[in-house]
């Protein structure tokens, strides 16, 4: 197990807040603040103007190159919310948005427009201080909007005033504008009996919260919640009143007919009726680096590929070039560059018929010892999320399904294949770890890969609270949810995955025993729902729409090859004819 005992105080959020509370001497502990960067030149920047309508804030940030060398500048916007001792936990520095200039020559200036919503500064009240069942809360008070060169160095400030609490729940002010339903506590079972770090009274519980765990046993409730192939009980998930869905119908629809059609359009039910039980089984169970073809609906088989640093495949030798690691991309603080990488990845995938990309990887640099930190963007959920949203948008707009991974709380690799239990409170889950996934999903992402670890006692790939309640119901996600590689089938159970929000298994060596009762109403219904998500993603990918055209250089190469081939054939024909003519003349002379 692993305890996220630090709560929301991850990375710079701890160091900045701990220094403000007098727990640490910042200059003795921190060498380079988060967001720090070097340049060959110098810049002046300030907040030149502010538009504030009470719903969103737009800053005009004036930047001027005051040095002797051309360069770019990043305007970083952090906010410091009002904190009330013993109340909702809040860090003193929180990245909310950023922008980067073009290349500025010496003496050249540029004004950046940076916009964000008030609700982006809300904190999640998992302890029911302001909302009984948990909610995002924008507490009354002064919010310092700081233009910074890094998390510690403030260059200019605008103070936004909130006159009264805004509570984003059904009993008060309704859901946030980006949510389909109001967020409420969904992950209480993952909190466990851990003591979480609190800012109250100047981090008075620091020693207790950071001490070695005293308890190494699951509670009775955690044992009851624990799920595996051995403990799976379909009755906990299946509707006893459900009737067997229609299968094998001849409705004359093809998947291409559903491109661009809304997820809940009745046409989808007609298409799903055409699938046989074997089709449903193959689409959901046989998902290792590919999606099977289904002739009856005109779906050709497609491939999926890894990973965050480029187009790589264990089964297709036509891999693309490797790119710098995602952490390097995040270090550029350059959203247009991230989008361009997504666009290029999509084009490379289209050339080798890979409709799915197992990337980007969204987990957090919780510590420097993360085994796959090079795949992940940052210690900051917002920087990770904004970078990924740009990259995923670039890829999705060009027809590629991005399976953002590993959903969720997979921030170490040791024991992950042994169903390691991750214990954390819901405020940390939502403000740090899920924030990174939330932004690319809400930007139009069509795919998710779950993780091997457990959320508290529940495998992430079979966690309804995560895959249905948060991902689908709250964030409005429609698409494909694949498991991580099924290397531990004793707990990575397909029966559970397809009933809790998963759509296909990254599995191999599939047999008919993969699901307990393949022909039961519950299993067929679950497979149908799962196939809907996968097919919806494919219908809006270049697997069907071919949104990404063949590059011009490929077309040119084909044309040149064809012309050269024609010339060579013509030359060969002429050579043969000339040879035969000469031979006949020689034979005539001999006679």
Q: What residue ranges belong to the model's regions?
A:
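Glycoside hydrolase catalytic-domain context in secreted enzymes
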Residues: 1-132, 136-151, 173-591
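Short beta-strand elements
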Residues: 153-176
